[in-house]
Amino acid sequence: MNLERVSNEEKLNLCRKYYLGGFAFLPFLWLVNIFWFFREAFIVPAYTEQSQIKGYVWRSAVGFFLWVIVLSTWITIFQIYRPRWGALGDYLSFTIPLGTP
């Protein structure tokens, strides 16, 4: 979709949908929202809906980076401590590596 051919109200509506969709445990939508609407929010000349789009883009960026931090922390903890958790670590694993930890 070419955003230049879409009305400003439709841009705002689409940006809002991507922002709200990110709350359904889909942080990739926030990343798409950031890349797709960054130009509309911060570079193009000002228009009425731009301030709302800017807010959605900023909040999408914050949400996405919080997801990255939480997911990176969980992956690091799981990789380091999984063998110590015994049966629980094995239960949470999709594949169980061979050998000793």
From Swiss-Prot:
Essential subunit of the gamma-secretase complex, an endoprotease complex that catalyzes the intramembrane cleavage of integral membrane proteins such as Notch receptors and APP (amyloid-beta precursor protein). The gamma-secretase complex plays a role in Notch and Wnt signaling cascades and regulation of downstream processes via its role in processing key regulatory proteins, and by regulating cytosolic CTNNB1 levels. PSENEN modulates both endoproteolysis of presenilin and gamma-secretase activity. It comes from the Eukaryota. Residues 18-36 dip into the membrane without crossing it. Residues 79-101 are lumenal. Belongs to the PEN-2 family. It comes from Bos taurus (Bovine). Keywords: Cell membrane, Endoplasmic reticulum, Golgi apparatus, Membrane, Notch signaling pathway, Transmembrane, Transmembrane helix. This is Gamma-secretase subunit PEN-2. The functional gamma-secretase complex is composed of at least four polypeptides: a presenilin homodimer (PSEN1 or PSEN2), nicastrin (NCSTN), APH1 (APH1A or APH1B) and PSENEN. GO terms for biological process: amyloid precursor protein metabolic process; amyloid-beta formation; Notch receptor processing; Notch signaling pathway. The keyword Endoplasmic reticulum applies. Its main location: endoplasmic reticulum. It is found in: Endoplasmic reticulum membrane; Golgi apparatus, Golgi stack membrane; Cell membrane; Membrane. Residues 1-17, 37-57 are cytoplasmic. GO terms for cellular component: endoplasmic reticulum membrane; gamma-secretase complex; Golgi cisterna membrane; membrane. The chain crosses the membrane at residues 58-78. InterPro entries: Gamma_Secretase_Asp_P_PEN2 (IPR019379). It is a multi-pass membrane protein.
